[in-house]
């Protein structure tokens, strides 16, 4: 797996950067990168903000089981990514996903509006990173 990641992650990172630049040239106010290995691959360096959607392990596991995963598959998927503590530490926005989908959607919409407001008012987005500002 490490060999495969060493071969693919740099190329994927270049393609991501090209796509982001293309979107911005076309006038998109922002681009969203949804990649479970973003931190591990170093792609967070091309992001103005890092969002982490968090839920307790029992909730995450239950949702994975409902999608047909086994607990072993769930554990393997989580082990292949950065630790949850590391994701939380690097995040500029943490969204609580322990509740229902409507509550999560409302939180995402609120943070997205705030982010777009920052993008519109500043050519260089600087999102606060302290937990108190999340």
Give a label for each model feature.
Residues 1-29:
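ATP-dependent small-molecule kinase phosphotransfer cores
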Residues 6-9, 71, 101:
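Flexible, glycine- and charge-enriched loops at secondary-structure boundaries
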Residues 18-30, 44-53, 57-69, 83-134:
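NTP-dependent small-molecule kinase module
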Residues 31-40:
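Switch II (G3) loop of P-loop NTPases
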Residues 80:
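Glycine-rich phosphate/nucleotide-binding loop
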């Amino acid at each position: 797996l490490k060999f495969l990641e060493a071969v693919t992650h740099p190329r994927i990172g270049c393609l991501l950067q090209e796509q982001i630049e293309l979107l911005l040239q076309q006038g998109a106010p922002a681009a969203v990168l949804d990649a479970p290995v973003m931190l591990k691959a170093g792609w967070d360096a091309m992001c103005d903000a890092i969002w982490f959607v968090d839920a307790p392990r029992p909730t995450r596991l239950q949702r994975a089981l409902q999608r047909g995963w086994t607990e072993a598959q769930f554990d393997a998927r989580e082990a292949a990514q950065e630790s949850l503590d590391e994701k939380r530490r690097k995040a500029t926005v943490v969204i609580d996903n322990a509740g229902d989908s409507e509550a999560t959607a409302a939180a995402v919409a609120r943070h997205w509006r705030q982010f777009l407001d920052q993008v519109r008012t500043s050519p260089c987005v600087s999102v606060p990173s302290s937990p108190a500002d999340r």
